[in-house]
A protein has these predicted regions:
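ATP/Mg2+ or Mg2+-diphosphate-binding catalytic cores
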Residues: 282-347
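Active-site ExK catalytic segment of metal-dependent nucleases
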Residues: 55-61, 99-101, 227-229
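Conserved structural core of kinase catalytic domains
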Residues: 85-117
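Active-site Asp-x-Gly
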Residues: 203, 217-262
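Active-site catalytic-loop/activation-segment of kinase and kinase-like phosphoryl-transfer enzymes
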Residues: 137-193, 341-346
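Catalytic-loop of the protein kinase fold
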Residues: 203-206, 210
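Conserved kinase catalytic-core helix
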Residues: 104-143
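Conserved NTP-binding catalytic cores of kinases and kinase-like/nucleotidyltransferase enzymes
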Residues: 1-94, 192, 196-202, 217-223, ...
């Protein structure tokens, strides 16, 4: 394994135009940096023959993530870390070396951040739009994916399982289940229609989280997207849902047009609105785990936000740690049975 690691590190060193790798040693990594995907992730300190040192991240990644990173590296890795893997064939987890961006995730105060993220994301999306035939390693978010996987196994099934296991959860949240199933099914139909439509299909990240999430780093003044473990050939709209409000999404639309994409704004608006529920569904399971045993006043902040998004399609604050004012409002709605009602807060 050690010899293999050196070969992989050398491959990345060549991409980054460094020297010859002399040896590797284990570096320090926090749990937060390692992430919560369950993948094996390490930081290794690299010493080159010229005496220079730097660190690299090693991740045991699935084929689709290794290939996504290879594709983005080959395209110039302007807003993704450079990466290298020896194995770009085996459909099993294999080691990949990744450029270490450090631990600074947020830009300093005063940086106009959203336009930079918009520009970078639009560049990645348009570069890979409608290239499904060239990316045979990338799974497709087709009707089967949405209906039999994302709205069931990934999300609402976890809700139903906890209802079966925890009578307290069932009493408090069980009334939401029929509407959750109904709204998520409508969402799946919309996404399946976008797959058939084809125009918006591209290499998507799928797990960009929100501005206080962990998958967009501030590095050398630019946004860098990391952790492509949830990548799919899917509508680009799902990458906008968690991170951008409608005003920022309009900046993204303008970037699409500047990159030569032909799309009416009314059509863009309709499709991005339909995609908002993606965030509620993709993060429903983590929010249920966070609720744990309750009470909702202490552990239900994330869960109420995800339920609000799925039940109404509204997305008032794009933050994991959203405001206490909004939490109080959602708690009140939850207690008086109006969480499922529209408030007009679609931003």
């Amino acid at each position: 394994l050690e010899h293999n690691m050196i070969i992989i590190a050398q491959g990345l060193a060549e991409v980054l135009q460094r020297g010859k790798v002399r040896h590797l040693e284990k570096g320090y990594m926090t749990d937060a940096e390692r992430g919560w995907s369950g993948a094996e992730v390490r930081r290794l300190e690299v010493t080159y023959e010229n005496g220079q040192k730097e660190s690299m991240i090693f991740k045991e990644a699935a084929l689709k993530e290794r290939m996504a990173m290879k594709t983005l590296t080959d395209q110039g890795h302007r807003n993704t870390p450079a990466a290298f893997s020896l194995d770009i064939v085996t459909d099993e987890p294999r080691w990949m070396a990744i450029e270490d961006l450090g631990s600074v995730k947020s830009p300093p105060p005063g940086v106009d951040w959203s336009p930079r993220v918009v520009e970078a994301l639009a560049r990645i999306h348009t570069r890979n739009m409608q290239r499904g035939q060239d990316m045979l390693w990338l799974p497709h978010a087709d009707a089967q994916y949405w209906e039999k996987y994302l709205i069931t196994l990934v999300s609402v099934d976890h809700f139903e399982t906890l209802m079966d296991q925890n009578p307290e959860f069932c009493r408090e949240f069980g009334a939401y289940l029929p509407s959750l199933r109904d709204k998520s099914s409508a969402f799946a139909r919309d996404m399946a229609a976008l797959y058939v439509e084809k125009e918006s299909l591209t290499l998507t990240h799928g797990d960009l989280q929100s501005v206080d999430g962990s998958h967009i780093h501030y590095y050398n003044g630019k946004p860098y997207f990391i952790d492509f473990g949830w990548c799919y050939y899917a509508p680009f709209y799902i990458d906008l849902a968690s991170y951008f409000n409608l005003e920022e999404a309009k900046l993204y639309y303008n970037e699409l047009i500047a990159n030569g994409v032909s799309l009416r704004y009314d059509d863009f608006y309709e499709r991005i609105r339909a995609s908002f529920r993606y965030s509620g569904l993709i993060y429903l399971c983590p929010s249920i785990r966070q609720w744990s045993l309750g009470p909702t006043e202490l552990t239900g902040k994330r869960l109420l936000q995800m339920l609000k998004i799925v039940l109404t399609g509204e997305f008032p604050e794009r933050r994991i740690d959203y405001s206490s004012e909004l939490f109080s409002k959602l708690l009140k709605e939850h207690k008086n049975g109006t969480l499922h009602k529209l408030n007009g807060n679609i931003f």
